[in-house]
């Protein structure tokens, strides 16, 4: 049986993730006390192949440090993966203000920002051991649903998933990136009048960048670096590795390089994904 534990700070998108898993055929249980998790798995192990449970701060044991020990009591036949959702503090505050929901930890004389900080501390034993961490600050509910679906389906083979993500430094570095490469020194199609409105997936931009020897060398060196160290990461039981490529706006150079790296690695591996975070953001 495959078990996915969905956790994260309040307002980060756990309900969206759980709905996606339900749509994918998972038997879903919302907000189960973690102390009951071993009993639940023993009950459903013969009836369901895929199970997902949502765990929030209200259902933790008295000592959150006991969480790894509780998970260790699960049947050995259960393949456990933890998905942890989070967002920047300012975005969580904004979401609570917009929805006018009450944070579950708010008590008398406790401000919202204090409750959010406390929740982060309480959930740290889960977040630090998560197999997949997603920061939802820059994701709409629809984008989050697509990303969760992509990552879950990408794990069918059980091998490590390699994600090549493009982004723009002007919009911030992806929080979930394991490796970050800066492509801002490369020739920029943005300054070519005919290419400015296109992106790194358009043929004219690809032709422009492919003609630059320095771009080809940059891609080759990243490719060689990752090929060298991926076997060591896999032996460390990593589920995902995200390689983020950044340029100024996240539309041309980083997109092209991420696509080329993914193309190269697909010759050797099956679980390759691409994510172009900022490709649809309008230029300012």
Swiss-Prot record:
Binding site for GTP: 56-59
Family: Belongs to the RapZ-like family.
Keyword Cytoplasm attributed: no
Family annotation (SUPFAM superfamilies): P-loop containing nucleoside triphosphate hydrolases (SSF52540)
Name this polypeptide is given: Nucleotide-binding protein CPS_4546
Example of a GO MF term: GTP binding
Top-level taxon of the source organism: Bacteria
Binding site for ATP: 8-15
Record's keyword annotation contains Hydrolase: no
Keywords: ATP-binding, GTP-binding, Nucleotide-binding
Function: Displays ATPase and GTPase activities.
